[in-house]
Every structure is written in C-alpha cells, then in structure tokens.
Amino acid sequence: MELWNFTLGSGFILVGILNDSGSPELLCATITILYLLALISNGLLLLAITMEARLHMPMYLLLGQLSLMDLLFTSVVTPKALADFLRRENTISFGGCALQMFLALTMGGAEDLLLAFMAYDRYVAICHPLTYMTLMSSRACWLMVATSWILASLSALIYTVYTMHYPFCRAQEIRHLLCEIPHLLKVACADTSRYELMVYVMGVTFLIPSLAAILASYTQILLTVLHMPSNEGRKKALVTCSSHLTVVGMFYGAATFMYVLPSSFHSTRQDNIISVFYTIVTPALNPLIYSLRNKEVMRALRRVLGKYMLPAHSTL
C-alpha cells in the first residue's frame, strides 16, 4: 500500500454524514439552522454575562466559558462541513486536519474539566453557602478556567503530534465529519494498536474522574436539597442543577461513546451521528437549557437586548 506523499497539495478526504445521508439537502439545511442557533444563543449569552454586572459571579463566569467553548467547538467543524458539501469538495490538508484535531480536542477536554468545576461551584453554593465567596473567589474561579484551558491544550497538543507522526495511506478516505483520532488511525499505514490502547486508557482517565466528581457533587447537593425547609429554595436549586445535569448527560454520553466504548461497538454511521450531536446539536442546545430555565439570565438578556440591540421604544 502506497504511503502518504507529504506535499503541500496533499490532503485527506472527509466523508461526513452529509455525503452519506439519504436527504443531504434537508440535513444541510437543518445543520445550518442549528449552527446559526448555536452562534446566536451562545453569542447572546456571552454578551449578557459580559455586559450585565449582576451576572459577574463565579457561576455565570463559568457558564460564559462554557458558551465560549461551545461556540469555538462548533465553529471548528460546522462551517467547513457545510462549505465542503456546497462546493462538492471534501478535501482537507494535512496541516488543516492537524489543526482541526488540536482545536476539537482542546475544546472537548476543556469542557470536560469545566463541567466538573461547575458542579463544584454548585456544590459549594448549595451545601456551604456561608463560605461560598471564600471558596469560589474571583481568583479561584479564574484559576479553574485557566486550568481547564491549559491542561486541555497540552493534552490536545500531545495527542495531535503523536497521531500525525504516523505514515498515512494514499487514496484513503476518513469517513467522519471531522479529523478525530479513532478515524484517522484507520488510514494509518502502521501498527497503531498500542496507541489505540493508550488513547482508550487516557480517554477513561480523562473522563471518569471528572464524571465521578460531578456525580459525587450532585449526590451531596441532592441530599442537602431534600432537607431544605423552603420549597422555593428547593425548587430553585433543583432547576439550576437539573440544567447542569442535562448538559453533563449530553456531553459525557457522546464522549463515552466515541472514546471509551471499544471499537467493536462502533459503526461509521453511528459515529457520524454522534459527531453531529456533540459538535452541532449540543452547542446549540446548551445555552437554551441554561438560559430558558434561569430567571436571572433571562432578565439579563432582556435588559441587554433592550439597551444595546432594540429600539428605544422597545417594550422589553
């Protein structure tokens, strides 16, 4: 089998779900709408959190970072997928593939850590309210944000460099929406079994501790909420936590399927559907899940829209 010729004009061929769909035009329109929804909803949420002084709190700072990650994640993948479909041109350069992989891994890894920190924030707020401002100071909050970005970036860099050092076979297609490790290794002209095992082990190591921390935090939160004397306080806590748990379930469900389940459980079609879910659907839904059930966020959005975007006579 002929090895990959690393020239400037060389590139992989990404055959994503749009190319394998029975109704590609309808799917393309749906993905376009979801992407626009992700841009608008995450953009508005970021604007509200940035401009509204009442939302300058740890909980909303972390939520703003989640929106930023979702916005960047979907923008790494979706515009190219749509442009490729419209141009009938599915190639991606070696460098472009490496960059896409690095950015996707960075956003995914950062979100994994950030969701754990968000769970800790809710745990402190509900279970230890008197010490909340001490434990979740501005410095501590920004340290959590920086930790998420730095650790995810370093991990993504190592994975990307090691994955792309393999020789790749000419005329092989990557039957996936984006350049991801499991699918790129399928076109490698070398024995990748040990590296695949390492990716699996590291995937478990990266995902499970964060998920365990989230579950432990919410177990303690649930026990505390059940003993709250105020029905209103109990309802508010449950609404906030249920929003976070919904996002956690969507993120970890997709990540576990892609990186933890053995390859025997995978099929090309399933992987493509899952990739659309976590790169396009989830970023579009996350801000809606948080904002529609959070009165503070909704009030802030109305104030920001009324002040900066709508005419002076707006009734918002």
Swiss-Prot record:
Gene3D superfamilies per the UniProt record, alphabetical: Rhodopsin 7-helix transmembrane proteins
UniProt keyword terms in alphabetical order: Cell membrane, Disulfide bond, G-protein coupled receptor, Glycoprotein, Membrane, Olfaction, Receptor, Sensory transduction, Transducer, Transmembrane, Transmembrane helix
Residues glycosylated per entry: N5, N19
Recorded family membership: Belongs to the G-protein coupled receptor 1 family.
GO cellular component terms, semicolon-separated: plasma membrane
Top-level division of the source organism's lineage: Eukaryota
Pfam family, one: 7tm_4
Reported function: Odorant receptor.
GO BP: any one term: detection of chemical stimulus involved in sensory perception of smell
Listed InterPro entries: GPCR_Rhodpsn, GPCR_Rhodpsn_7TM, Olfact_rcpt
Disulfide-linked positions: C97-C189
Topological category with respect to the lipid bilayer: Multi-pass membrane protein
Extracellular topological segments: 1-25, 80-100, 159-195, 260-272
Entry's localization field: Cell membrane
Transmembrane segments: 26-49, 58-79, 101-120, 140-158, 196-219, 237-259, 273-292
The name this protein goes by in its record: Olfactory receptor 2AG1
Cytoplasmic side: 50-57, 121-139, 220-236, 293-316
Molecular function (Gene Ontology), one example: olfactory receptor activity
